[in-house]
């Protein structure tokens, strides 16, 4: 499973709890979309995740900016994700960012608003914030191969992924599909 979190905004720890903490510990890969805030928080995520792929956000200190890039590409189960904290130009700018990187979808943060939009030229995924939702639901995203839950983690070979926006209390409030 690929787990996506963003906008922790903490000085000391990862602020993970409930299903979000469990998902981070069980994930094959965790993508953090920036705004850890302080280096100790990045360290805390590295201690919990098997594999952490992160980008820095506009509120991250210099120590974080020295350790992780501003943008990156992550491949999972044959699907390529362009990852950034934020990008100028709204949805169009995010789609252009993804196309420049040959991505199948774009993962971004910054707004603290959990969102999936499949109506754009490339699907856009924002996990929201598990720790500082700012009037939204606290959330993270879980993405796995279609059929993985039914096939004991095997999934299918067609490159289709199923995603969910989930609260720390295990409420799945949006499901979506992605493909190559």
Model-predicted segments: where are they?
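Binuclear metal-dependent phosphoesterase catalytic core
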Residues: 101-102, 125-180
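Extreme N-terminal starter segment of soluble prokaryotic enzymes
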Residues: 1-3
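Conserved catalytic scaffold of divalent metal-dependent phosphoesterases
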Residues: 5-14, 19, 23-32, 36-133
């Amino acid at each position: 499973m690929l787990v996506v979190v963003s906008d922790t905004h903490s000085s000391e720890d990862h602020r993970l709890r409930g299903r979000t903490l469990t998902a981070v510990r069980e994930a094959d890969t965790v993508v953090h979309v920036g705004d850890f805030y302080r280096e100790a928080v990045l360290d805390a995520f590295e201690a919990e995740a098997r594999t952490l792929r992160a980008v820095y956000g506009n509120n991250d200190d210099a120590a974080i900016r020295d350790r992780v890039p501003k943008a990156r590409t992550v491949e999972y189960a044959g699907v390529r994700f362009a990852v950034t904290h934020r990008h100028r130009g709204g949805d169009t700018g995010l789609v252009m960012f993804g196309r420049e990187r040959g991505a199948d979808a774009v993962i971004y943060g910054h707004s603290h608003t959990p969102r999936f939009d499949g109506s754009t030229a490339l699907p856009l995924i924002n996990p929201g914030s598990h720790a500082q939702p700012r009037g939204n639901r606290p959330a993270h995203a879980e993405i796995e191969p279609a059929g993985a839950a039914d096939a004991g983690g095997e999934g299918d070979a067609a490159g289709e992924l199923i995603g969910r926006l989930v609260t720390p209390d295990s409420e799945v409030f949006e499901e979506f599909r992605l493909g190559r």
